Amino acid sequence: MYILTIIKNIKLMKNITLVYSSIFSFIFITCNAQVKLNDIPLQDEVKNYTLETVVSGIQIPWGMTWLPDGTMVVTEKTGILYQVKDGVKTEIKNLPKVYNRGQGGLLDVVLHPDYKKNGWIYITYSSTEGEGDGGNTKLIRAKLQNGSLIQIESLYKASPNTTKGQHFGSRIVFDKEGFIYFSAGERGDHFVNPQDITRDNGKIYRLNDDGSIPKDNPFVGKEGAKEAIYSYGHRNPQGLAMNPFTGAVWEHEHGPQGGDEINIIKKAANYGWPVVTYGIDYDGTSISTESEKPDIEKPIYYWLPSIAPSGMAFVTSDRYPDWKGHLLVGSLKFQYLELVKLKKDTIIGRQKIAVNIGRVRNVAQGPDGYIYIAVEGKGILKIIPN
């Protein structure tokens, strides 16, 4: 009888422990559920367009641009550079060796604003060159001749290398004055790189078109500083675009779990990572208890929960009257395109486009005025208004 009583008590204690465990799990999940108070509502899409496949068979299309004759140049993350004409893709030869690991690989591609005269194409990719094992983000320029890259010039290589697979960035954009900006993520060393201007990574860089350092860069002459740095305190910027209406460079970056940001890039500005963040770590623990601090630039908008943004483009085309003057951002996580409605530098509305299309890696407005989206596993699609 005594033994039976002990067994019953043990079973009861197990049940009580299970109940308490469930309660604490519920409390933990509830407390860590990410809700942004007074957020701008995300409107459902109004499908007044059709989608047309421009080219298929590109598994992770990352960057895209257009030659003067309308030929597209597309990067595929694993390390293939394509030119696409009339739906047919052809591999461009003589690409430097790409370090294809994790989130690294062949990344962005843009043309020089005066491409018709000088023929320069700019590319970022992860490279093994330099100090240490692994790789880091590199910027080159080259010319295209007879389907092959020639006159390849190294413009900047972040260092040291690391075998970590995350946060390479990278996007490239020219401003109205002809300076080139490119991004490099913090390579997974968020307590080391982003806040230290003597180290690469977690930065937006600004260079002359030949890779030299502009004399008015903010950290020129500062002892030990990487003089190419224009802004710092970034996590993993995968959106970079010049606002055609103001000339300012806009950026978006991945937060951790929550806290993806849209920022307007300012000279010498600190964007806070990881000192401040609106997100939490992937295990639910806190990275920082603060989301704002003096002398740290606040984002003009942040997503909570994360959408995992990739690619961004301002719409200037008359083909899309309801979208003109606003911003498009791809979502990897939720697999749609987000129309971010603007009133000058203020976000006033949000709307879904191309719902369930797949992981949107990039978005761009072509020289023909159409919007093109790069979707993982599908290739490049064109949005045609009805």
Predicted regions and their residues:
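Bacterial Sec-dependent N-terminal signal peptides
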Residues: 1-36
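Beta-propeller blade signature
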Residues: 137-147, 197-209, 265-266
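Short edge-strand/loop segments of extracellular domains
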Residues: 144, 254-260, 264-271
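Acidic, Gly/Ser/Thr-rich repeat motifs that build Ca2+-stabilized beta-propeller blades
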Residues: 34-190, 239-242, 247-255, 305-343, ...
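Blade/loop signatures of beta-propeller domains
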Residues: 34-50, 149, 212-222, 278-295, ...
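Beta-propeller fold detector
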Residues: 52-55, 89-96, 150-157, 215-219, ...
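Conserved blade-ending motifs and adjacent loop-strand segments that build the rim/top face
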Residues: 347-367
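Loop-centered beta-sheet repeat module
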Residues: 198-207, 216-248
